[in-house]
Amino acid sequence: MANGHKWFAAIYDRMMAGEEKGFLKHVRSHIVNGARGRVLEVGAGTGANFPYYEASDARTVVATEPDPYMLARARRRLEELNLPIELQQTPAEGLPFADESFDTVVSTWVMCSVGDLDGALREIRRVLKPRGQFRFYEHVRSTHSIGAFFQDVVAPACSWFGADCHPNRDVAAAIEGSGFQLMEFRRLHPYPNIPPVSVSRPHILDVALPN
């Protein structure tokens, strides 16, 4: 991650343009519009969530992204939007913030690619206030044996081509195991159940609260 993923950052927004105009527009609106108070977004990527903060109750927004190439694109997007969002280059596993310092933490398609899933979730739990919300949208391990097997088989290739993406992670279980209670759990299937897109299904959408 120190060197980043230059080619992936270069194609990401174009690759996702169709989804951004379709289902992702509604997902991002739901996740981000519900943010309130002091907000931390981990793994901001190219800043696709940024436009949606205008309609939220966020008082301040800090966005982190470890990849320098993704971060550069996020900075350019932020300049175009002219929004008061603070950007920092830092991984989710090592957040440089005080305990219980955020009212909301946001992540969209982040937990598949963090280097240490449990470590990242512990950090999110640490910086979130006791009555705060962790609002997330992630793609996760299939609940069907054949789908999960396919994810396991292609996981090494996905990690190489997809900027460290691991499609076979049971993110929901990891979140619950890190001291959160899932409150609005929804399992979504925006992609058809055919290879290769089926590797990224299902998706989960939720608001989690600290236990």
Segments and roles (model prediction):
Residues 135-157, 162:
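Conserved class I S-adenosyl-L-methionine
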Residues 118-133:
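A short glycine-rich, Lys/Arg-flanked "PGG" loop and its adjoining helix->strand segment in the class I
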